[in-house]
């Protein structure tokens, strides 16, 4: 049933991993997805939010029958619309610069994690001391 009173329409922003998944492998809990679809069918917006790429969240929103909008890359990108559009809020160039700066100052190998391609960030494997990297970022006043 579609919500008749537009003042009662709500927007639900729902995390994917660890919230509507069954395990660390990304298996979607179908019961949770069904409840979210019921909210959408009742006239509410159901938006998926994830640290993954927004394209992954967007595809799940389509196949799951939810609102065709997803926030991804830790808030860096919004993917939406029936004609797929991306709103970039982050700047991948700044991330690449920060990575190069950290790599030049730490004496360890820093590897990018093989994940779905990102538009606004880089994803790193946990092969280095994050606190040392944070000190470099802060000391060089990097905008990441």
Label the model's feature ranges:
Residues 19-20:
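Hydrophobic "anchor" residues
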Residues 1-14:
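Non-catalytic pre-domain segments flanking phosphatase-related domains
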Residues 27-116:
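Active-site phosphate-binding/coordination module
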């Amino acid at each position: 049933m579609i919500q008749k009173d537009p003042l009662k329409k709500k927007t639900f922003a729902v995390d994917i991993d660890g919230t509507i998944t069954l395990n660390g492998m990304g298996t979607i809990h179908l019961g949770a997805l069904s409840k979210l679809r019921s909210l959408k069918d009742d006239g509410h917006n159901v938006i998926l939010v994830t640290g993954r790429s927004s394209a992954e969240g967007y595809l799940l929103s389509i196949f799951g029958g939810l609102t065709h909008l997803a926030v991804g890359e830790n808030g860096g990108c919004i993917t939406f619309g029936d004609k797929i559009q991306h709103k970039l809020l982050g700047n991948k160039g700044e991330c690449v610069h920060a990575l190069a700066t950290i790599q030049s100052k730490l004496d360890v190998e820093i590897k990018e994690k093989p994940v779905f391609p990102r538009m606004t960030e880089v994803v790193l494997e946990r092969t280095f001391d994050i606190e040392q990297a944070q000190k470099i970022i802060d000391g060089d006043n990097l905008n990441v």
